Amino acid sequence: MDLQFDICQRCHLQGTAILHQGKSFTDFKPGEHLEEIMDVYLPRFENDNSFIMASHVDRLKQSECFNNSDMTCVSCHNPHKSVQLVEKNYFDKKCMDCHNVCRDEENVSDCFVCHMPKTSSIDIPHVSISDHKIAIPNKISKVTKEKIFIGLVSINNNSPTNISRAMAYLKRYESFEKNPIYLDSAYYYLNQSPKSLAFPSFLQYYYLKKDYYSLI
Protein backbone atom coordinates (compact mmCIF):
# COMPACT_ATOMS: atom_id res chain seq x y z
CA MET A 1 0.00 0.00 0.00
CA ASP A 2 2.84 2.40 0.86
CA LEU A 3 4.54 1.80 -2.49
CA GLN A 4 1.28 2.45 -4.29
CA PHE A 5 0.81 5.65 -2.31
CA ASP A 6 4.31 6.82 -3.21
CA ILE A 7 3.47 6.71 -6.91
CA CYS A 8 0.63 9.18 -6.33
CA GLN A 9 2.53 11.50 -4.04
CA ARG A 10 5.45 11.85 -6.44
CA CYS A 11 3.25 14.34 -8.34
CA HIS A 12 0.40 15.15 -5.97
CA LEU A 13 2.70 16.14 -3.12
CA GLN A 14 4.67 19.27 -3.89
CA GLY A 15 6.56 21.52 -1.54
CA THR A 16 10.19 22.06 -0.65
CA ALA A 17 11.82 18.93 -2.06
CA ILE A 18 15.25 17.94 -0.75
CA LEU A 19 17.03 15.26 -2.75
CA HIS A 20 19.10 12.69 -0.92
CA GLN A 21 22.81 12.69 -1.64
CA GLY A 22 23.54 11.35 -5.13
CA LYS A 23 19.87 11.30 -6.18
CA SER A 24 18.06 13.24 -8.92
CA PHE A 25 14.39 14.03 -9.53
CA THR A 26 14.27 11.40 -12.28
CA ASP A 27 15.55 8.58 -10.07
CA PHE A 28 12.20 7.62 -8.55
CA LYS A 29 10.60 4.58 -10.16
CA PRO A 30 7.31 2.85 -9.29
CA GLY A 31 7.98 0.18 -6.71
CA GLU A 32 10.45 2.34 -4.78
CA HIS A 33 9.90 4.36 -1.63
CA LEU A 34 9.84 8.08 -2.37
CA GLU A 35 11.64 8.77 0.92
CA GLU A 36 14.67 6.92 -0.49
CA ILE A 37 14.95 9.62 -3.15
CA MET A 38 13.78 12.84 -1.50
CA ASP A 39 12.05 14.46 1.46
CA VAL A 40 9.17 16.83 0.69
CA TYR A 41 8.54 19.58 3.25
CA LEU A 42 5.57 21.84 3.83
CA PRO A 43 5.17 24.54 6.48
CA ARG A 44 2.87 24.03 9.43
CA PHE A 45 1.04 26.93 11.05
CA GLU A 46 -1.13 27.21 14.11
CA ASN A 47 -4.54 28.77 13.38
CA ASP A 48 -4.22 28.34 9.63
CA ASN A 49 -5.92 25.84 7.35
CA SER A 50 -4.75 27.07 3.94
CA PHE A 51 -2.87 24.84 1.52
CA ILE A 52 -1.18 24.77 -1.88
CA MET A 53 -2.61 23.31 -5.08
CA ALA A 54 -0.64 20.04 -5.17
CA SER A 55 -1.12 19.11 -1.52
CA HIS A 56 -3.66 16.34 -1.97
CA VAL A 57 -1.48 13.84 -0.11
CA ASP A 58 -0.71 16.18 2.78
CA ARG A 59 -4.36 17.04 3.29
CA LEU A 60 -5.52 13.43 2.96
CA LYS A 61 -3.01 12.34 5.61
CA GLN A 62 -4.69 14.75 8.04
CA SER A 63 -8.06 13.03 7.57
CA GLU A 64 -9.53 10.65 10.13
CA CYS A 65 -10.88 8.59 7.24
CA PHE A 66 -7.32 7.98 6.10
CA ASN A 67 -5.73 7.47 9.52
CA ASN A 68 -8.41 5.07 10.77
CA SER A 69 -8.69 2.83 7.72
CA ASP A 70 -6.76 1.24 4.86
CA MET A 71 -7.78 4.09 2.58
CA THR A 72 -5.48 5.05 -0.30
CA CYS A 73 -5.82 7.37 -3.28
CA VAL A 74 -7.22 4.58 -5.44
CA SER A 75 -9.93 3.88 -2.88
CA CYS A 76 -11.72 6.77 -4.56
CA HIS A 77 -9.77 7.56 -7.73
CA ASN A 78 -9.37 5.38 -10.79
CA PRO A 79 -5.90 6.42 -12.03
CA HIS A 80 -6.83 5.33 -15.56
CA LYS A 81 -10.03 7.36 -15.84
CA SER A 82 -10.55 11.11 -15.63
CA VAL A 83 -12.83 12.39 -12.88
CA GLN A 84 -14.64 14.27 -15.64
CA LEU A 85 -15.83 10.96 -17.11
CA VAL A 86 -17.22 9.23 -14.02
CA GLU A 87 -20.92 9.23 -13.19
CA LYS A 88 -22.26 12.04 -11.06
CA ASN A 89 -22.66 10.04 -7.83
CA TYR A 90 -19.45 8.02 -8.26
CA PHE A 91 -17.60 9.60 -5.34
CA ASP A 92 -20.64 9.69 -3.07
CA LYS A 93 -20.91 5.93 -3.51
CA LYS A 94 -17.31 5.66 -2.35
CA CYS A 95 -18.22 7.50 0.85
CA MET A 96 -21.27 5.32 1.35
CA ASP A 97 -19.11 2.20 1.23
CA CYS A 98 -18.06 3.14 4.78
CA HIS A 99 -20.63 5.71 5.89
CA ASN A 100 -24.38 5.17 5.60
CA VAL A 101 -25.68 7.93 7.84
CA CYS A 102 -25.93 11.65 7.08
CA ARG A 103 -27.36 14.00 9.68
CA ASP A 104 -27.85 16.81 7.17
CA GLU A 105 -31.19 15.99 5.59
CA GLU A 106 -30.69 18.58 2.85
CA ASN A 107 -27.45 17.05 1.54
CA VAL A 108 -27.87 13.31 1.91
CA SER A 109 -26.57 12.67 -1.62
CA ASP A 110 -23.73 15.16 -1.91
CA CYS A 111 -21.02 14.26 0.59
CA PHE A 112 -18.28 16.39 -0.94
CA VAL A 113 -20.05 19.72 -0.67
CA CYS A 114 -19.73 19.51 3.12
CA HIS A 115 -16.79 17.23 3.77
CA MET A 116 -14.44 18.11 0.88
CA PRO A 117 -15.48 21.64 -0.07
CA LYS A 118 -13.97 23.41 -3.04
CA THR A 119 -11.67 26.25 -2.08
CA SER A 120 -8.77 28.26 -3.45
CA SER A 121 -5.07 27.46 -3.13
CA ILE A 122 -2.49 29.86 -1.72
CA ASP A 123 0.03 29.37 -4.53
CA ILE A 124 -2.09 29.53 -7.72
CA PRO A 125 -4.72 32.27 -8.05
CA HIS A 126 -8.12 31.92 -9.71
CA VAL A 127 -8.39 28.15 -9.32
CA SER A 128 -10.52 25.97 -7.09
CA ILE A 129 -9.67 22.58 -5.66
CA SER A 130 -11.48 20.05 -3.51
CA ASP A 131 -9.91 20.03 -0.08
CA HIS A 132 -8.67 16.46 0.44
CA LYS A 133 -8.76 16.79 4.21
CA ILE A 134 -12.01 14.92 4.74
CA ALA A 135 -13.58 16.47 7.81
CA ILE A 136 -16.77 17.36 9.61
CA PRO A 137 -17.47 21.03 8.84
CA ASN A 138 -17.24 23.34 11.82
CA LYS A 139 -19.10 26.54 12.37
CA ILE A 140 -17.10 29.44 10.98
CA SER A 141 -15.49 31.39 13.77
CA LYS A 142 -15.83 35.15 13.57
CA VAL A 143 -12.64 35.56 15.57
CA THR A 144 -9.51 35.92 13.44
CA LYS A 145 -6.59 34.25 15.19
CA GLU A 146 -2.95 35.02 14.55
CA LYS A 147 -1.22 32.63 12.17
CA ILE A 148 1.81 31.21 14.00
CA PHE A 149 4.59 29.33 12.22
CA ILE A 150 5.32 25.96 13.82
CA GLY A 151 7.95 24.54 11.49
CA LEU A 152 8.66 22.68 8.27
CA VAL A 153 7.41 19.10 8.27
CA SER A 154 8.52 16.28 5.98
CA ILE A 155 5.27 14.86 4.64
CA ASN A 156 6.63 11.67 3.09
CA ASN A 157 9.32 10.80 5.65
CA ASN A 158 8.68 10.66 9.39
CA SER A 159 12.40 10.56 10.23
CA PRO A 160 14.34 12.96 7.99
CA THR A 161 17.99 13.59 8.79
CA ASN A 162 19.10 16.84 10.39
CA ILE A 163 20.99 17.83 7.24
CA SER A 164 17.81 17.31 5.22
CA ARG A 165 15.91 19.54 7.64
CA ALA A 166 18.61 22.20 7.43
CA MET A 167 18.61 22.16 3.64
CA ALA A 168 14.82 22.46 3.61
CA TYR A 169 14.91 25.64 5.70
CA LEU A 170 17.65 27.11 3.51
CA LYS A 171 15.75 26.32 0.33
CA ARG A 172 12.53 27.68 1.79
CA TYR A 173 14.29 30.95 2.66
CA GLU A 174 15.95 31.24 -0.73
CA SER A 175 12.99 30.23 -2.89
CA PHE A 176 9.83 31.31 -1.10
CA GLU A 177 10.10 33.72 1.80
CA LYS A 178 12.96 35.67 3.36
CA ASN A 179 11.93 34.83 6.90
CA PRO A 180 14.84 34.95 9.42
CA ILE A 181 13.24 32.08 11.32
CA TYR A 182 14.18 29.78 8.44
CA LEU A 183 17.85 30.71 8.72
CA ASP A 184 17.82 30.28 12.49
CA SER A 185 16.29 26.83 12.13
CA ALA A 186 18.73 25.88 9.37
CA TYR A 187 21.66 26.88 11.58
CA TYR A 188 20.33 24.77 14.44
CA TYR A 189 20.03 21.63 12.30
CA LEU A 190 23.37 22.23 10.59
CA ASN A 191 25.04 22.14 13.98
CA GLN A 192 23.34 18.80 14.66
CA SER A 193 24.69 17.31 11.41
CA PRO A 194 28.05 15.68 10.57
CA LYS A 195 30.49 18.41 9.55
CA SER A 196 31.44 16.61 6.35
CA LEU A 197 27.83 16.71 5.16
CA ALA A 198 27.01 20.14 6.55
CA PHE A 199 29.93 22.09 5.06
CA PRO A 200 28.31 22.99 1.68
CA SER A 201 25.09 24.03 3.43
CA PHE A 202 27.03 26.14 5.92
CA LEU A 203 28.43 28.05 2.94
CA GLN A 204 24.89 28.57 1.64
CA TYR A 205 23.75 29.65 5.10
CA TYR A 206 26.43 32.33 5.46
CA TYR A 207 25.82 33.54 1.91
CA LEU A 208 22.07 33.90 2.48
CA LYS A 209 22.73 35.59 5.81
CA LYS A 210 25.14 37.95 4.00
CA ASP A 211 27.83 37.04 6.50
CA TYR A 212 30.55 37.12 3.87
CA TYR A 213 33.37 37.30 6.43
CA SER A 214 32.50 33.79 7.64
CA LEU A 215 32.80 32.51 4.07
CA ILE A 216 36.51 33.30 3.98
Residue ranges and their predicted role:
Residues 186, 215-216:
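Tetratricopeptide repeat
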Residues 156-174, 193-210, 216:
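Amphipathic alpha-helical repeat scaffolds of TPR domains
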Residues 84, 90-93, 190, 201-205:
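Amphipathic, soluble alpha/beta structural segments
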Residues 185-188, 192:
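The canonical alpha-helical register within tetratricopeptide repeats
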Residues 1-184:
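Primarily the internal scaffold of c-type cytochrome electron-transfer domains
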Residues 140-145, 209-215:
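Alpha-helical linker/edge segments of TPR/alpha-solenoid repeat scaffolds
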